[in-house]
């Protein structure tokens, strides 16, 4: 039955209603979030403290860690509170805020991934010009531009989604405030909103994916010209790890946002969103950083200094 009263709060259905699964899921999500927190904030601190990591590649990695922490924190704590207390309500303004920051950080990540791919292209394909290509100003502009695009995109999508009238129901068939489940609750004409999402997300993803694919195409060509089989295998292994994370990120994003609203199945979307919003931020420090010898060396030095400081105190 249609309700003509505008909603002031939403009810997030969550992942499951089974009471026996709430505590186990809370523990799992808490574990994932703690790894995300320690991994990403630890990576930022490590890069700041070690002068050997003050290079363009690690500058982008530190920003990637920041946005991973940002969009995970926009979603995961509220989900965990729901598991622990059973509180599924979220105020209208809180829902809009959660949606805004999630979109802002997820978009910034998309452009940062493209910047990282370009940085690797410059390092591997144009090594003699690398220092003049990836200057401090260029790196800063790429990072700042990623955040500007992120918050601009978030403003567009938040305004586009929350300008609609939600008078049919306030029950969101999802575990956080996202565009597809919110659009299904609207009693306004959703066509324009769906087209805005499709074209804006499509443009952002297409631009970033093209930069990544073209960069890696030249990288692979350069790798194939390497004479050392060991060096070639190592470079291929590194690129494969990066491309795996990129494929998961863009694959789930395209699956979520570049389909008509009528083809969304909330159960499937929830599972995709778990990977997109919660698991990927946990994996990125491992895929992009902890496999790196320079990061491992910096970590060992930091731990050694910490042990020495503790020994000196006691």
From Swiss-Prot:
Pfam families: 7tm_4
Localization (cell): Cell membrane
SUPFAM superfamilies reported in the protein's UniProt record: Family A G protein-coupled receptor-like
Coiled coil regions in record: none
GO biological process, one term: sensory perception of smell
Single GO MF descriptor: G protein-coupled receptor activity
Keyword Glycoprotein carried by entry: yes
InterPro entries, A to Z: GPCR_Rhodpsn, GPCR_Rhodpsn_7TM, Olfact_rcpt
UniProt keyword list: Cell membrane, Disulfide bond, G-protein coupled receptor, Glycoprotein, Membrane, Olfaction, Receptor, Sensory transduction, Transducer, Transmembrane, Transmembrane helix
Glycosylation, residue list: 3, 261
A single GO cellular-component term on record: plasma membrane
Disulfide-bond pairs as recorded: 95-187
Membrane topology: Multi-pass membrane protein
Cytoplasmic topological domain: 45-52, 119-137, 216-235, 291-314
Topology feature Extracellular, residues: 1-23, 74-97, 159-194, 257-269
Principal location: membrane
Transmembrane segment boundaries: 24-44, 53-73, 98-118, 138-158, 195-215, 236-256, 270-290
Keyword Transport among UniProt keywords: no
Record's function text: Odorant receptor.
Family recorded in the similarity comment: Belongs to the G-protein coupled receptor 1 family.
Name of the featured protein: Olfactory receptor 5B12
Species of provenance: Homo sapiens
